[in-house]
Amino acid sequence: VASGGPKRRIQLTGFRGREKKALVELLFKLDCVFLDSKKYKNCTHLIAKKLCKSEKFLAACAAGKWILTKEYIINSAESGRWLDETTYEWGYKIEKDTHYSPQTQSAPKRWRKELMQSSAPGAFHRWKVILAVKEGGKRMMSVIRVLQAGKATICSSQNMGSDITHIFLHNKFFLLQNEKHFPEDQCYPLQYIEDYLLE
């Protein structure tokens, strides 16, 4: 059986309605914990309907988790046991006729292998981050979960140490208001997080 070790913790992203319901029914036939949440919940395997930039997709990439196609669930359920993940991983085959670059398509596989080989705890483990953005919005909480999944250290802008590596800004206007505090070469738009993972 391919399913040695601890139970798989499965999340889904991009599935709705009937399709999601059918996959969840199959999951109940398999030995796993299904985490039904819109937020990333430290799953071991993310099943994605398509390549996307959802919080769960980015967080799973940053944490080096398996990101797989739905066939992984369907075929495993048919076999009555978990199959080997390799051929079901997003990035296993690079598609030609898609608007996603080969680099983006291979991102899940690339990060999983890189983090496994380097034993790094996450894609952002060397980052010390300040979020110079409006507090508490939904998007903000989502960005924080992605950064935490990749093991970034998030610092408050009050204690601006010299070892800060990245300052993320909502927009340039914020920078103008706070120009004295932030060294320009450490300032990045939020978009950079996505690009760093997928490009």
Language-model-detected regions and their locations in the chain:
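The feature marks the first
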Residues: 6, 11-49
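BRCT (BRCA1 C-terminal) phosphopeptide-binding modules in DNA damage response/checkpoint, repair
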Residues: 2-4, 38, 51-128, 132, ...
